[in-house]
């Protein structure tokens, strides 16, 4: 039940900006550590303002650390994924990750700034939720939530309570 509540809270609030308390940064540092164990200390995460109401992220470097900026946790996680793909030539997927990273991560060649298209980025379907996700344990749910955040998803299908309407 505890994990169910955590998943519900994450899904409900993942698209909302969090300012001040460091909650978004902590969540993304934890995500980085899960995806690339031992590398989180090579990143610096910073919150920035949205651009004209749209989610935005930046990838930069300061010569020592990789700087990821975003207006919420999903934007920061998306910046992390962009950095892995286009600077490290690494890949994170459902079917196995390609993460052969050097001990010292490379600096981005240039500062990259991206606006994430669409206010709501939808993901999942009833088959996934009904036939597959029902068998997931907490680690598998955490992997899926990380994957969603890294791919800018802020509106996953969440059908809890729908059976109450149907029946």
Segments the model singles out, each with a brief description of its role:
Residues 4-14:
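Sec-dependent N-terminal signal peptides
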Residues 12, 54-61:
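Short, flexible, solvent-exposed loop/turn segments with mixed acidic/basic and small polar residues
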Residues 18-22:
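Boundary at the C-terminal end of the N-terminal hydrophobic targeting segment
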Residues 23, 31, 37, 48-52, ...:
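Feature activates predominantly on carbohydrate-active enzymes
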Residues 43-47:
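Generic structural signal for residues in well-ordered beta-strands
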């Amino acid at each position: 039940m505890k994990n169910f509540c955590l998943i519900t809270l994450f899904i409900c609030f993942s698209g909302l900006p969090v300012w001040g308390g460091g909650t978004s940064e902590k969540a993304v540092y934890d995500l980085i550590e899960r995806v690339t164990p031992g590398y989180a200390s090579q990143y610096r995460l910073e919150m920035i303002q949205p651009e004209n109401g749209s989610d935005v992220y930046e990838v930069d470097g300061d010569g020592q650390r990789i700087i990821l900026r975003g207006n919420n946790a999903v934007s920061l996680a998306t910046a992390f994924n962009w950095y892995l793909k286009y600077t490290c030539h690494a890949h994170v997927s459902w079917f196995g990750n390609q993460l052969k990273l050097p001990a010292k991560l490379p600096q981005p060649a240039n500062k990259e700034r991206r606006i994430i298209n669409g206010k709501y980025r939808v993901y999942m379907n009833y088959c996934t939720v009904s036939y597959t996700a029902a068998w997931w344990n907490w680690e598998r749910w955490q992997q899926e939530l990380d994957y969603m955040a890294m791919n800018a998803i802020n509106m996953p299908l969440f059908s809890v309570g729908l059976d109450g309407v149907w029946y």
